Amino acid sequence: MGQKTHPYGFRLGITKDWKSHWYAERSDYSSLLHEDWAIRNYLKKNYYQAGISLIEIERKAANRVDITIHTARPGMLIGRGGSEIENIRKNLIKLTNKNVFVNVQEVKNPELDAQLVAENIAMQIEKRINYKRAMKQAINRALRAGAKGIKVMCSGRLNGAEIARSEWFREGRIPLQTLTADIDYGFAEAFTISGVIGVKVWIYKGDVPELHKEAIQELPEKAVPKKIEDEDLYEKDEVNYDVDA
């Protein structure tokens, strides 16, 4: 059975960047890793309705944490006069015992963000909307927004079935094995009466232009046949080709 590797981890360092930027000695690594998890868990759990797509964490000093939150609804995080963002900062300072600086960035096209699309489908399933309808609506919105391909898969006890199964819909291209392809991936869970339903979304936005040009330049030249005189064709049965190694 063929299994699909994680599209994000597969492209780390090529088209995708790390979600955390810091270096630590071996003795401190595990504690900082748990701290990153606690920060992300606090934000996703308490501000799930804000449509948080990505949380970037950067540590430039031992006692400083810079957090960038990418969200579709920045107003819910900032609050009136910046009151809510200040409340978030104070809670994160208590959580980490470090100086915390929070920056909020708006996601311009939520329909093209795989994580937000997956969470939106999961929320609709929790509200007892038919999963097929939710999946097809998400696909249509993404294609109208400019996606070149999208695949959505739901797994679990769909419609309360006794046996769990997986169903998926796909439109356009999803070149998972092409490293220069800009593929966004998102995963969310819908908690229903029947059990947990997993939602996975792949969105293909096109190739990364710079990497695509480099890949074309690195390709070997095509085999070019030798120029053969007419009289040579009668003397030789085979035609030789020079192929650049």
Curated annotation (Swiss-Prot):
One of its GO terms (cellular component) is cytosolic small ribosomal subunit. Residues 39-108 form the KH type-2 domain. SMART domains: KH. GO terms for biological process: translation. It comes from the Bacteria. Binds the lower part of the 30S subunit head. Binds mRNA in the 70S ribosome, positioning it for translation. Part of the 30S ribosomal subunit. Forms a tight complex with proteins S10 and S14. This is Small ribosomal subunit protein uS3. It comes from Dictyoglomus thermophilum (strain ATCC 35947 / DSM 3960 / H-6-12).
